[in-house]
């Protein structure tokens, strides 16, 4: 059964509460843009593509309810203003993720164009919005599968396959990934994890490695959950083990499977290729460069922000200090009907200052390719990405 982070039918939206994973599977209903804002800000739903879709669909559900209760203005301009204000509010929930802002801008444009049509009423403006939001859900899964196929092909053609010394089959690859970029971060299949899924589906994956991804543990809680669910051969490591793992490539250890590529997702890609992603991504890119391992970013074109010139222009969200100083989970061994009581414990000294940026920026110079739904973008001979070409 395929994992679903988002369940939607017209007028009804629920999200898988990712704060409770992997211990509890609970779907939270969202009835309005306000509900979605809190779900996104609290990270019950996360991943740049997923939050954009949830935000868009939450407003679609709210509009449906207003129309059903005859509370929707008949005036097209009033409905347009209402929708635009709600979209602006939703964007404020996670400002670093460009997909949300891009979706809001695109949906707002659709609504404005509809409102200008002579003879339309407010309900028709709302219907135009709802139809566009629903298409986002459908398109994301299709785009993710394309990313997976393009990325898998590129890795097999350009990355060094794992060696015979490790006991692996010739032509297979091992991939390291960071954070969570799978079905739980998108409408389905995933971006970077989608590439891993595609490699596994063709029998080309030797092993996937996933980082714990402190401080929110998206790797150990979510990516590991997806890999186990899909029965993909995988190993969990802590963030500070990545260098040692890559060093085993050079050592030629008979006990190890060499890493062929590091593939990550993105929350925002600047026009020059600089990429904002989960904190720790930059460090992995530096390690990849030193160890001669290919470093790839997997993201749909909606994540590429051509209006942001470089990574220096990307606003980095800072999260609460408690995410670093506390850990939440069930007490080991205490289970009742498959559910466990969740507890929060403190793991740091009281009074210590905390710096907790949610993202870092990886310079384009450290990135070998950007995998999109229309192909893999590589740098030219001068070392520059030309991302505008994929929008032509």
UniProtKB/Swiss-Prot annotation:
Reactions that this protein is recorded to catalyse = 5-(methylsulfanyl)-alpha-D-ribose 1-phosphate = 5-(methylsulfanyl)-D-ribulose 1-phosphate
* Enzyme class, spelled out: isomerase
- What start-end ranges are recorded for coiled-coil regions in this protein? none
**Which pathway does the protein contribute to?**
Amino-acid biosynthesis; L-methionine biosynthesis via salvage pathway; L-methionine from S-methyl-5-thio-alpha-D-ribose 1-phosphate: step 1/6
Question: One GO biological process from the UniProt record?
Answer: L-methionine salvage from methylthioadenosine
- Which parts of the sequence are marked as the site Transition state stabilizer? 179
Q: What does this protein do?
A: Catalyzes the interconversion of methylthioribose-1-phosphate (MTR-1-P) into methylthioribulose-1-phosphate (MTRu-1-P).
The record's similarity note reads: Belongs to the eIF-2B alpha/beta/delta subunits family. MtnA subfamily.
Q: Which HAMAP family match?
A: Salvage_MtnA (MF_01678)
- UniProt-recorded name of the protein: Methylthioribose-1-phosphate isomerase
From the broadest rank down, the organism's phylogenetic lineage runs: Eukaryota, Fungi, Dikarya, Ascomycota, Pezizomycotina
Its gene is MRI1
